[in-house]
Swiss-Prot record:
Gene from which this protein is expressed: pnp
Intracellular or extracellular location(s): Cytoplasm
Statement: the UniProt record of this protein carries the keyword RNA-binding: yes
InterPro entries documented for this protein: ExoRNase_PH_dom1, ExoRNase_PH_dom2_sf, GPSI/PNP, KH_dom, KH_dom_type_1, KH_dom_type_1_sf, NA-bd_OB-fold, PNPase
Keywords tagged on the record: Cytoplasm, Magnesium, Metal-binding, Nucleotidyltransferase, RNA-binding, Transferase
GO MF term set: 3'-5'-RNA exonuclease activity; magnesium ion binding; polyribonucleotide nucleotidyltransferase activity; RNA binding
Keyword RNA-binding: yes
Cofactor(s) this protein cannot do without: Mg(2+)
Residues the record lists as binding Mg(2+): 528, 534
Descriptive protein name: Polyribonucleotide nucleotidyltransferase
Domain S1 motif positions: 665-737
Swiss-Prot/TrEMBL catalytic activity: RNA(n+1) + phosphate = RNA(n) + a ribonucleoside 5'-diphosphate
């Protein structure tokens, strides 16, 4: 029996010295009863099946396009059995949900306007290499199956992950589809999606439709410790341009396969269109009322007025015996179009927005900390009618989130949860488990803060941040970033820098025969709905930490995007001033927060600390009222409700594993075991090292400033040192002891 005809096309992604990646599209073999299906491979190891199905009839009562995107992570793809009780995949992982949103955002605006037939895209991850990140590959898979389906679809859409790699001598390079291990040397990471469009001069360009970006976990260390380039607004714009050739290659491969295999375009009914007579009737009836309504500053008052105007328009034009009876859909479409035109023309011509602000004006800001009793950290951030409460909770590292998904990341200690109750917009609705939007907003705020978190060694706590959206009128996600900075500082978390976020918008229209653009700072909910772009930017004073961009336009001029980025930076710096005026450094930890300290024991002593069947460690926990966890490298974390209990547990552990604990003032002839840009690590005794900071090395260099540690000390060299400090985690700070120095003389005097 002759098998099915299988056809394929591929895109070669050339990253220069970083190697090549090959994305292959295949159709005709699997899921042949779906409207469109495709297998997509990257380097032949990671593969996924995408299938697009189309409903036969329009959904009644829907005034939007019913598109559903689902991502199925199969554990067999990684050679694993699910960890659930029934050993079967259950609800989607957070990674899968975020990938659904990543696919939906560029695909949805590419469908024909007015469609009401239900469309479902299901992407199933069939196999995955351990070091692979599959989410942007899934965008291409979903686009391929949809392009083949015959749906009215202005695709194909290409998706690519770009990483800003830090190179020697401060250089950098953007690479496509980085592997997870490569991100350790990257300072910025972004997913970009777009499609090929025809320019006015007949050429081709790539219209960017979606961006999801963040600074990496290692960005701070790479920038501050190794001199890597910081991800500025200019570099982000450079990365977007660098992504375009890769997106075009992916779109070209899809178009090649679609040209040979696409089904005839489906003839589906369209809704929401309207004739010229309906447009004229709506404009004549509404008159100046539309402009007056959209000049009301208050959200609730404006919404009440718009509801009344909308109701009056329908009653007057579509009621029984009225000229447009039975044509309510047309009148609705004309009304929405007039609303959009009224708002846009006022912004572009008069430079005045809905609430009377100028294009770059920020609404009134308010920042307050310590707003709830007993919690570990809390804050309230308000921007106009948007109100966010942030609450921080600290616990031991063993409470960090364990991740059971196909992601190479298996745990995380910083968790951001975002809640959006219906009362935040003055409405009723379901409450309970989070919806996809809440998960997406929480993930965006989490990515914005992650690059400035202290290391596990500096702050050995699991951190849960919750953002409660108590009032919503524009960018609660960026409000959550601001509230998180405040609450984390209030909880005593030593952030490396404060982070603020701002939501930008863009409107465009033809004015006097010319297309004009206007970037809006701090957009309202209505400006988001009626505009062309939603652009969220978060960052510190020095660099960008997270970006999310969605646009409805077929390409944004580079100058317009650069201007919007600069405008966003100015707004971010202003908001940071407000945040730091409320709190500019970590507070003392709450008395209700657990105290977590650490001690290092030799790996060979771990068994002695635990004892037979856990007898020893259980006895210490019972005697001291503490909670103890031991890492494989010998790091012991001790959690307690108060400091004395934690110290008692540490003393008990030291008595077993470190019977001789160094104290301040003790001197050792140590051996240099490692040099860094900021100092040298000196081994005092087996398993006990200390840091000799570069600022302490003057005495070893004739009291002259030391610029390079290696000019004074080298690995293996012996050096006489004195312990000057033992911090609460048992870390030692050292100073050199030189014959004839002040410290040596003082010691001789005491003797």
């Amino acid at each position: 029996m002759e098998g099915p005809e299988i056809q394929s096309a591929e895109a070669v992604i050339d990253n220069g010295s970083y190697g090549k990646r090959v994305v292959r599209f295949e159709t005709g073999r699997l899921a042949r009863q779906a409207a469109g299906s495709a297998m997509v491979y990257i380097d032949e190891e990671t593969s996924m099946l995408s299938a697009t199905a189309v409903g036969k009839h329009p959904r009644e009562g829907f005034d939007f396009f019913p598109l559903t995107v689902d991502v199925e992570e199969r554990m067999y793809a990684a050679g694993r059995i699910p960890g659930s009780f029934f050993r079967r995949e259950g609800r989607p992982s957070t990674d899968a949900i975020l990938t659904c949103r990543l696919i939906d955002r560029p695909l949805r605006p590419a469908f024909g306007k007015g469609l009401r037939n239900e469309v479902q895209v299901v992407v199933t991850v069939m196999s995955i290499a351990p070091d692979e990140i599959y989410n942007t590959v899934a965008i291409n898979a979903a686009s391929m199956s949809t392009t083949l389906s015959g749906m009215p679809f202005q695709g194909p859409v290409g998706g690519v992950r770009m990483a800003l790699m830090a190179e020697e001598n401060g250089g950098h390079q953007w690479i496509a589809f980085p592997k997870h291990s490569q991100l350790e040397n990257a300072v910025f990471d972004m997913a970009v999606a777009g499609r090929v469009v025809t320019t006015k001069d007949g050429g081709q360009d790539v219209a960017i439709m979606m961006v999801e970006a963040e600074a990496t976990d290692n960005a701070w260390e790479l920038i501050k410790g190794q001199g890597a380039v910081a991800p500025s607004e200019e570099l982000v714009a450079e990365g977007l341009e660098a992504s375009k050739p890769f997106i075009k290659a992916l779109c070209d491969a899809q178009a090649d396969l679609a040209a040979r295999n696409r089904k005839p375009e489906l003839d589906l009914p369209r809704f929401g269109g309207f004739g010229d007579d309906a447009a004229q009737a709506v404009e004549q009836f509404v008159g100046e009322r539309m402009a007056q309504v959209y000049s009301i500053a208050g959200k609730q008052e404006r919404e009440a007025a718009t509801d009344e105007l909308h109701h009056d328009t329908l009653a007057e034009l579509t009621g029984e015996g009225k000229p447009f009876e039975g044509r309510a859909d047309e009148v609705n479409g004309a009304y929405q179009a007039l609303t959009k035109q009224t708002v846009r023309q006022r912004i572009l011509k008069d430079k005045v927005r809905i609430d009377g602000r100028g294009l770059t004006d920020i609404r009134q800001l308010s920042a307050e900390v310590d707003v709830l009793p007993r919690v570990h950290g809390s804050a309230l951030f308000e921007r106009g009618e948007t109100q966010i409460m942030g609450v921080t909770t600290l616990n031991m590292l063993k409470m960090e989130q364990q991740i059971d998904s196909l992601s190479p990341v298996k745990h995380k200690r910083y968790i951001h949860h975002y809640n959006f109750p219906p009362y935040s917009t003055g409405e009723t609705g379901r409450v309970g488990s989070p919806k996809r939007r809440e998960i997406g907003h929480g993930a965006l705020a989490e990515r914005a803060i992650t690059p400035v978190l202290p290391s596990r060694e500096e702050f050995p706590y699991a951190i849960r941040q919750v953002s409660e959206a108590l009032g919503s009128n524009g960018s609660t996600s960026m409000g959550s970033v601001c509230a998180s900075t405040l609450a984390l500082y209030n909880a005593g978390v030593p952030l490396r820098a404060p982070v603020a976020g701002i939501a930008m918008g863009l409107v465009s229209d033809t004015v006097d025969g010319e297309v004009q653009y206007a970037a809006l700072t701090d957009i309202l909910g209505a400006e988001d709905a009626l505009g062309d772009m939603d652009f969220k930017v978060a960052g510190t004073r020095e660099f960008v930490t997270a970006i999310q961009l969605d646009t409805k336009l077929d390409g944004i001029p580079a100058s317009v995007l650069a201007s919007a980025l600069t405008q966003a930076r100015e707004a971010r710096l202003y908001i940071l001033d407000v945040l730091t005026s409320a709190i500019d450094a970590p507070d003392e930890m709450s008395e209700f927060a657990p105290r977590v300290i650490s001690v290092t024991v030799p790996v060979s002593k771990i068994g002695e600390v635990i004892g037979p069947k856990g007898k020893m460690i259980n006895q210490i926990q019972e005697d001291t009222g503490t909670d103890i966890s031991i890492e494989d490298d010998g790091t012991v974390y001790i959690g307690a409700t108060d400091g004395p209990s934690a110290e008692a547990a540490r003393s008990a552990i030291n008595a077993i594993a470190n019977p001789q604990v160094p104290e301040v003032g003790e001197r050792y002839l140590g051996t240099v075991v490692k040099t860094t840009t900021f100092g040298a690590f000196v081994s005092l005794t087996p398993g006990k090292d200390g840091l000799l900071h570069i600022s302490e090395m003057r005495q070893l260099n004739d009291d002259k400033r030391v610029n390079e540690v290696d000019d004074v000390l080298s690995v293996g060299q012996k050096v006489q040192v004195e312990i000057t400090k033992v911090d609460d985690r048992g870390k030692l700070s050292l100073a050199p002891v030189v014959a004839g120095s002040d410290s040596d003389a003082a010691s001789d005097d005491e003797n």
